[in-house]
């Protein structure tokens, strides 16, 4: 009987509770001003890689490791995707994209505080945010509380999964990278 009680006590107190993990993720995320990372993005089964810088609120610069020099940039209000492939240049209002939610740290923190969150495979912690017919799934590492990726639909309703790695937090990032590229 004592062995069973000891085992139950050990199990209950040796694993972090979901509430504890959630609180640590919120604390860690609230301290972030900017992020630099490498990424792998999967859209419709096709993988692309690259690197990104995010400055909260609402700025992102991503350069893809792609032969067409694809760049994605938001200055906080507009989003531009530029590629040398057929001289492509697309400009969108940021508020019309799922990135509008992802790049708004205050909004994400508010939502995370009100959501339960889910533990996935004892490794990842998921927050699923729904807003304006958009779903944003944000994944964090359960052990170090770092952001590890997100899943959403792009502006064409394609499922987009982004996995991030080599994460660096609160680095010096020059604001000029968020200047929107010109249409050639």
What are the roles of these predicted feature ranges?
Residues 110-184:
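Gly/Pro-enriched, hydrophobic low-complexity segments
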Residues 4-13:
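Sec-dependent N-terminal signal peptides
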Residues 85-124:
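Flexible, surface-exposed loop/linker segments and immediately adjacent secondary-structure boundaries
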Residues 17-19:
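Boundary at the C-terminal end of the N-terminal hydrophobic targeting segment
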Residues 52-101, 160:
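An acidic-aromatic
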Residues 41, 58, 64-68, 76-78, ...:
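A mature extracytoplasmic/lumenal domain signature
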Residues 32-34, 47, 57, 74-76, ...:
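Extracytoplasmic
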Residues 27-47:
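A short, Trp-centered hydrophobic/proline-enriched beta-strand micro-motif
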């Amino acid at each position: 009987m004592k062995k069973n009680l000891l085992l139950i006590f050990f199990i209950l107190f040796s694993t972090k509770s979901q509430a504890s993990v959630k609180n640590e993720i919120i604390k860690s995320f609230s301290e972030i001003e900017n992020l630099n990372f490498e990424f792998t993005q999967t859209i419709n089964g096709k993988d692309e890689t690259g690197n990104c810088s995010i400055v909260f609120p609402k700025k992102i610069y991503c350069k893809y490791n792609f032969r067409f020099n694809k760049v994605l940039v938001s200055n906080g209000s507009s989003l531009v995707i530029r590629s040398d492939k057929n001289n492509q240049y697309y400009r969108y209002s940021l508020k019309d994209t799922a990135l509008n939610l992802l790049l708004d740290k205050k909004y994400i923190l508010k939502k995370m505080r009100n959501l339960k969150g889910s533990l996935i495979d004892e490794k990842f912690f998921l927050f699923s945010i729904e807003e304006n017919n958009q779903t944003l799934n944000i994944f964090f590492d359960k052990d170090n509380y770092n952001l590890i990726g997100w899943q959403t639909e792009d502006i064409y309703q394609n499922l987009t999964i982004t996995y991030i790695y080599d994460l660096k937090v609160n680095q010096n990032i020059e604001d000029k990278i968020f200047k929107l590229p010109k249409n050639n």
